[in-house]
Amino acid sequence: MSKGTPSMGKMNKMTHIACRRCGRISFHAQKKVCSSCGFGRSTKMQSFKWDTKRPKTPTH
């Protein structure tokens, strides 16, 4: 495998397509799993604690 211009010719396939649940272009066409909401893997919406901004708390 070489890097650079020859490798760019291989980048013509759609890896991710639109997700039926969240609508984002995050549904992996081969794996059949959405990387954004977890559709295809889980019935619950994927969410993380670090994803939401928490209110500032006093430090002293």
From Swiss-Prot:
It comes from Methanoregula boonei (strain DSM 21154 / JCM 14090 / 6A8). This is Large ribosomal subunit protein eL37. The keyword rRNA-binding applies. Its cofactor is Zn(2+). Binds 1 zinc ion per subunit. Binds to the 23S rRNA. GO terms for biological process: translation. InterPro entries: Ribosomal_eL37, Ribosomal_eL37/eL43, Ribosomal_eL37_CS, Ribosomal_zn-bd. Zn(2+) binds at residues 19, 22, 34, 37. The keyword Metal-binding applies. Pfam families: Ribosomal_L37e (PF01907). A zinc finger (C4-type) spans 19-37. GO terms for molecular function: rRNA binding; structural constituent of ribosome; zinc ion binding. Belongs to the eukaryotic ribosomal protein eL37 family. GO terms for cellular component: cytosolic large ribosomal subunit. NCBIfam families: PRK04179.1. Keywords: Metal-binding, Ribonucleoprotein, Ribosomal protein, RNA-binding, rRNA-binding, Zinc, Zinc-finger.
